A protein has these predicted regions:
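Extended, highly charged
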Residues: 1-288, 292-304, 308-493
Length: 493
């Protein structure tokens, strides 16, 4: 099922029995986030929340409800992308990557259905007034204080838009980028844009600054859930996130022209903030911010965005999220990326069977990888290859295990790893780029990494002892116990 709007997504969550409507007055300053944090820590991620009576900083009631933890469970994450299991999209990517031009006219004709599917992905421009421009604030009408922008943690530098889709365009090639960068509210019409140096939006800004030209920026808040997710996906700079969202939705994203700048926006967005960055202006202080590491990221200097227009639907929902000590909603977004992009990782490192980034590792700190080991030193080959893969280059600890290990179960992965390693023999250290949020690295964005080879050791690797087999019950006994289990009076596992 493809969902075209955020409201449709919320209705689908409600129909699935996973939405709690909070009708009691709750402050956008801290209270809303404390409630959300407690819910996100519940087993399975807790329900989605729709706060219908949000109190703004001036004590008045917001006209707009706030949705939070909308993506915060495995079932809701799958629902948002229109699949039963997140691996389903990975399977679709595998089939596309396996496209080989067959011999003969009939063979070529057999490819048409898959090629036609690809042709449906690019976004389409919508004619007429789009839903996202049913209400328009321009110039002096712009007042960000009227939006339920949340303050998450006590030491945060201010209120933050935490689920934005930041739209920019490459000034050289005209390629659009949609990124998810936190945005701090500084005033009624001013924001601070936190895009880290390695992000595509930051590269666009640097290019515009070198030219001395104002940079148009659009911030969409709320859209179809596939587009919202795609803004967080680690796509190459040349891939339009709206094309990827079209692939996930199985139909194109509808776009519309912004009113005050030369950019396109999701036609079905709930809110759109249009504006610009002036390269002649000094950078502004952004932060601190309670981040997904569970620690505050410190204040730093970033560009200011001047908002020239705010447009919205007539009855919009303001989506938000919070990050902090794991597990949080962002774990489920990251898990979707893990499942969807596995085929692309296998394309360049074919011996990989699976990989997993557990919640405690907050994505970049810990990665488990299972491989089909065929020759000595292969685990280290895989480590080096993964450290050369885009954002995987930021991984601090890589643990490589054999193909039979379920890396999606961290308890099993650690059990195998801690039994299989000789620390001196099986660990390797190297230096490389680190996440900008890593406060432990010896230098900003640069530090050490550790690789752990927890695979079964081969004689060629200098292991001369017998390697013990894993304990397993025989299949006949398991079948016999399965048959008698209902009569034993023991609760089902």
């Amino acid at each position: 099922m493809s969902l075209d709007t955020l409201n449709e997504f919320v209705q689908a969550i409600d129909a699935a029995g996973e939405l709690v409507r909070v009708r009691q007055p709750v402050k956008a300053h801290l209270e809303l986030c404390e409630i959300a944090d407690r819910v996100m820590k519940q087993p399975g991620g807790g329900p989605a929340l729709l706060f219908e009576h949000v109190i703004l900083r001036d004590g008045t009631r917001s006209r707009f409800p706030v949705g939070i933890n909308l993506f915060g469970s495995m079932s809701r994450m799958a629902l948002s992308l229109g699949v039963e299991e997140l691996d389903d999209h990975g399977d679709r990517i595998t089939k596309l990557l396996d496209l080989k031009v067959p011999e003969g006219i009939m063979g070529k004709l057999s490819m048409l259905p898959r090629l036609m599917e690809v042709a449906k992905f690019p976004p389409r421009m919508q004619s007429g007034t789009p839903p996202c421009q049913e209400v328009v604030w321009r110039g002096d009408e712009v007042d960000l204080d009227q939006l339920p922008i949340i303050t998450c943690w006590p030491e945060d530098g201010g209120p933050y838009i935490t689920f934005p889709m930041v739209i920019t365009k490459d000034p050289k090639r005209g390629i659009r980028n949609v990124g998810m960068y936190r945005v701090q509210q500084l005033g009624k019409n001013t924001l601070a844009m936190h895009w880290q140096r390695h992000k595509v939006g930051a590269a666009h800004w640097r290019e515009m600054a070198e030219r001395g030209e104002r940079m148009p920026v659009v911030i969409a808040i709320g859209a179809d859930p596939a587009s919202m997710y795609s803004a967080s996906a680690p796509l190459p700079p040349t891939v339009d996130e709206f094309i990827f969202a079209g692939f996930l939705r199985r139909k194109p994203v509808q776009l519309a022209k912004a009113l005050t700048c030369d950019l396109e926006v999701p036609a079905d967005a709930d809110f759109v903030l249009e504006g610009y960055i002036d390269p002649a202006e000094a950078l502004v202080t952004e932060g601190p911010f309670g981040d997904h590491t569970g620690f505050y990221s410190l204040a730093d200097l970033y560009p200011a965005v001047h908002v020239t227009a705010v447009t919205m639907r007539r009855n919009p929902i303001f989506p938000a999220t919070i990050v902090g000590r794991p597990p949080m909603e962002d774990f489920y977004l990251g898990h979707a990326t893990e499942r969807i992009f596995l085929p692309l990782l296998k394309l360049t490192i074919p011996e990989i069977v699976d990989y997993h980034m557990p919640a405690e590792g907050i994505f970049h700190n810990l990665v488990f990888v299972s491989i089909r080991k065929e020759y000595p030193g292969q685990a280290y080959k895989v480590m080096n290859a993964m450290w050369g893969q885009g954002l995987m280059s930021l991984a601090k600890v890589l643990v490589v295990v054999d193909d039979w290990v379920n890396v999606r179960n961290p308890q099993e992965a650690w059990w195998v790893a801690l039994n299989n390693i000789d620390p001196e023999r099986d660990t390797r250290f190297t230096m490389g780029p680190m996440d900008v949020l890593d406060h432990s690295s010896r230098a900003f964005t640069y530090g050490s990494k550790m690789g752990i080879d927890a695979t079964k050791k081969l004689p060629e690797e200098g292991f001369t002892r017998d390697w013990p087999p894993v304990i397993e019950m025989d299949e006949a006994t398991k079948r016999a116990v399965d048959a008698m289990w209902p009569s034993l009076g023991i609760p089902a596992r």
